[in-house]
Amino acid sequence: MSTSSVPSLTYFQGRGLGQFSRVLLSYLGIPYENITVTEISDALRATLPYGQLPIYRDGDFVLTQSSTIARYIAKKHNFMGKNLEEEFLVDQIVTAIHADIFPAFNNPVPEKLQKLYEKYFGSFEKKLQETGFLVGSSVTLADLYVYVGFDYIRFRGEAALSSELSDEKYPKIAELKKFFESNEGVAKYIKERPETKF
């Protein structure tokens, strides 16, 4: 368990579900302790509410479930939109990525995956073309989530049908990727991130 005064995020060394919060914390410039493990030991498991990672500790407050962690960080740091309606629109995109897109590419059926990508990333691309942002008139967790999800699928390669997500097909999402990766905190995180399979 971390004894640091800054928040801590515990997850495996790979990108996986920890990537969303790691990129978010880096983008927002929030100091945190990035604790990586190779396995969930019995001692660690005993501290986990549901026996799984990632887990986020902010003082005495403990959260698990990757999308919940990201929402908490974003809400705490005013990155969930400017009002209640925008917050729920952000939440809608976060849920789509976690509930529909990620489970599908982990057990891919090419035809279904292609349609799923076109459905969601096509919608995201259209919204970015229209307004420049996925929700409201400023960058939110929704934009970051689409960037991280898009980038992770391409990182996973053809097993995840990554060729369907080209810069040519989704130029605005490609611009979103450049935007986040030009951020000093995100650029530093990417440079220091170890090469892993997942």
Swiss-Prot record:
EC top class named in words: transferase
Catalytic reactions of this protein: RX + glutathione = an S-substituted glutathione + a halide anion + H(+)
Top-level taxon of the source organism: Eukaryota
GO terms under biological process: glutathione metabolic process; response to curcumin; slug development involved in sorocarp development
CDD domains per the UniProt record, alphabetical: GST_C_Sigma_like, GST_N_Sigma_like
The GST N-terminal domain, residue ranges: 5-81
Domain GST C-terminal per the UniProt entry, residue ranges: 83-198
Modified residues (N-acetylserine): 2
GO molecular function terms noted in the UniProt entry: glutathione transferase activity
Gene3D superfamilies referenced in this protein's UniProt entry, alphabetically: 1.20.1050.130
Binding site for glutathione: 11, 45, 52-53, 65-66
Cellular component terms per the entry's GO annotation: phagocytic vesicle
EC number in record: 2.5.1.18
Family affiliation: Belongs to the GST superfamily. Alpha family.
Purpose of the protein: Conjugation of reduced glutathione to a wide number of exogenous and endogenous hydrophobic electrophiles.
Name of the protein in its database record: Putative glutathione S-transferase alpha-2
Originating organism: Dictyostelium discoideum
Lineage: Eukaryota, Amoebozoa, Evosea, Eumycetozoa, Dictyostelia
Name of encoding gene: gsta2-1
